[in-house]
Amino acid sequence: MEIDISKYRNIGIMAHIDAGKTTTTERILFYTGKQNRIGEVHDGAASMDWMEQEKERGITITSAATTCFWNGYRINIIDTPGHVDFTIEVERSLRVLDGAVAVFDGVAGVEPQSETVWRQADKYSVPRVCFINKMDRIGVDFYRCVNMIKSKLGVVPLVIQLPIGSEKDFKGVVDLISMKAIIWEEETLGAKFSYEDIPSDLLDKAQEYRNLLLDTAAGMDDEAMNAYFESNDLPVDLLKRCVRSGAIKGAFVPVLCGSAFKNKGVQPLLDSIVDFLPSPVDVDEVVGTDPKDLEKKIKVKPSEKEKFVALAFKVMTDKFVGSLTFIRIYSGKLKSKSTVLNAGKNETEGIGRMLLMHANNREDINEAKVGDIVALVGLKKAITGDTLCSSDFPILLERMEFPEPVIEIAVEPRTTSDQEKLGIALSRLVAEDPSLRMSVNAENGQTILKGMGELHLEIITDRVKREFNVDVNIGAPQVAYRETITKSVEIDYTHKKQSGGAGQFAKVKILFEPLEAGSGFQFESKIVGGAIPKEYIPGVQNGLELIKEGGMVSGFPVIDFKATLIDGAFHEVDSSPLAFELAAKGAFKEMASKAGPKMLEPIMKVEIITPEEYMGDIMGDVNSRRGQVLSMETHNNSTIILALVPLASMFGYINVLRSMSQGRAQYSMHFSCYEQVPQYVVNELKYN
């Protein structure tokens, strides 16, 4: 079916864990006719949760792509995980999407991971609509949730629906644009619904919220503003145009409600995706750079008449077809069996097959065009973040940034004969998951896996066993500590070696400066007048990149500092990139003792929900874990405690929390920042 690009919607479904993302996606697929039955998460039958671990645990672990059609529009959907350990899946999905549906639990409201995924969407300027889900649950409060969206996310929630009833009495919604009630039929699994008059007890509230809707939306369009001043109302088409304009600009976020599990509210959500979220031609042109001149900017027009440009946002291994590279096409067309240029690597690769994916089901296609999200078979070198393009149009698109791991474990095969198989398995999994890192301990030869949390690493080791048939022994989780500097120092270092024949000579003067938390490592060269030839400067950066991973005092990677190469000297015969790499390493070692090295630890933002009677014990326990309580809020006889706690104090916390609350309290946490480790804790670590 040939569909114009203006009728494409590339969207993601994002939320905190258990808000109902996958259930919402399953209903979308059912009502659009993509599948003829509803897959339930709790039965392990959701089509989008296809991994064995997802079915067993009832959670989404990896982002899954699919395509469906609604009223002549093509909707490409990526269902993303809600658990913080898999936030990388959200990051890379949002990088290539034009819009998103943020799903909220109508009882819990805005939760910690809701805030995290919202910030990720802000980073890529992704327009959103909000769907307040679970309107049938006990304790649901639509209006509280709307207020939380405003206060916690700092956006203007534009309410375009009101719930009719709540909890077990939830029947449908009031559509504030048409000023009609929408009621769903239970016996048809929500496939049939009717438009009715608004219930009399909701008329005043509906009119109040419609006036707010008109006041907010009319300002998006001069024609609408004039019409609103004249008649104090707007025709439906003009009002929809205003809501669409404001949503795409980010002036406000349309808010809808429903219960995906009870089959209510999903069709209007589909209408809102079509009506209020952008097509590829509605968003800003993608801007890339020339691989040969990174200062030169190149704009990419979303047209199939332009040269082919795409971004690889995910790589995964399929046991039937091998390596799959998921791409979003930003311009041009691509045919199967053709070749593409990997601009970052300056290498051309051939494509075998091209697939349209529905979770892990594959459909072969011969051609894809601008706006499409497809999977390519046959690429050997492409990794997440690579730009693929026409050979005669080299361009680099902005890569994604991935968070640093916060936890690590030692992994070894149970039998030495499996050592090679383990290496192959982990290499493939690391290639799939940019938030997973692997290294080998130089002292004892142990393989170290680093990830975003205990669950992340648990899933990875489980996949090693299931998918690669390698049984492994796993060490206890360890915190991924870091080091940093606290003082600025200037180091003048000369590397000189003479042992017959050509020697080695390199002199560098480097200014090392501490940076704000989260800045990582930055390198800058201020060499002028040829003090060091251009071709030797990358050797300095490479030397620093390598040596910082080994730490300064405690052996942990060094972060949040800047190294500026300000001067140096070279020898016509004895200088080389290697000599300058060694000089940089020498300067770093000398700097380590002078720059006030400090050890850093990951701090987690923890949300605990507990019945009020256990609050005192839980607060005391948080304090004993070096925690800092940020806020407390009471809702529906439960207390919500928000705290910052070192990750080192959180291992096995769920068992302690259950014991203190007789199994009634729950918690979630996500990475917040790195902070200095108190000296007494450093001493304990050294002693242990």
UniProtKB/Swiss-Prot annotation:
Pfam families: EFG_C, EFG_III, EFG_IV, GTP_EFTU, GTP_EFTU_D2. The keyword Nucleotide-binding applies. GTP binds at residues 15-22, 79-83, 133-136. The keyword GTP-binding applies. Belongs to the TRAFAC class translation factor GTPase superfamily. Classic translation factor GTPase family. EF-G/EF-2 subfamily. Catalyzes the GTP-dependent ribosomal translocation step during translation elongation. During this step, the ribosome changes from the pre-translocational (PRE) to the post-translocational (POST) state as the newly formed A-site-bound peptidyl-tRNA and P-site-bound deacylated tRNA move to the P and E sites, respectively. Catalyzes the coordinated movement of the two tRNA molecules, the mRNA and conformational changes in the ribosome. This is Elongation factor G. It comes from Wolbachia sp. subsp. Brugia malayi (strain TRS).
